[in-house]
């Protein structure tokens, strides 16, 4: 009787392993999705300029006039990036 239960346990483990190998886990799905996406969907090359703009705003009590150069640098970067994307 013990051999029957151990055989049943082994069969159950094999079924679980085969079903796990057939279905990729969530991490593998996400990894594949990320790898197949365009760079623009996850990466903004102008994010550094955006971060600097926000830091300037915080430093200057959210006075937009004090951070105009940062905003312009971000707009220029974004414009250049979108133009480059359009032609590639």
From Swiss-Prot:
PROSITE patterns: CHCH
A GO cellular-component term linked to this record: mitochondrial intermembrane space
Location in or out of the cell: Mitochondrion intermembrane space
Chain coiled-coil ranges: none
Domain of life: Eukaryota
Subcellular location, principal: mitochondrion
Positions of the CHCH domain: 43-85
InterPro entries hit by this protein: COX23 (IPR051040), Cys_alpha_HP_mot_SF (IPR009069)
Composition bias, Low complexity: 1-23
One BP annotation, GO: mitochondrial respiratory chain complex assembly
Function in brief: Required for the assembly of cytochrome c oxidase.
Motif (Cx9C motif 2): 67-77
Disulfide bond residue pairs: 46-77, 56-67
Organism the protein comes from: Aspergillus clavatus (strain ATCC 1007 / CBS 513.65 / DSM 816 / NCTC 3887 / NRRL 1 / QM 1276 / 107)
Full protein name: Cytochrome c oxidase-assembly factor cox23, mitochondrial
SUPFAM superfamilies in alphabetical order: Cysteine alpha-hairpin motif (SSF47072)
Stretch list, region Disordered: 1-31
Gene, per the UniProt record: cox23
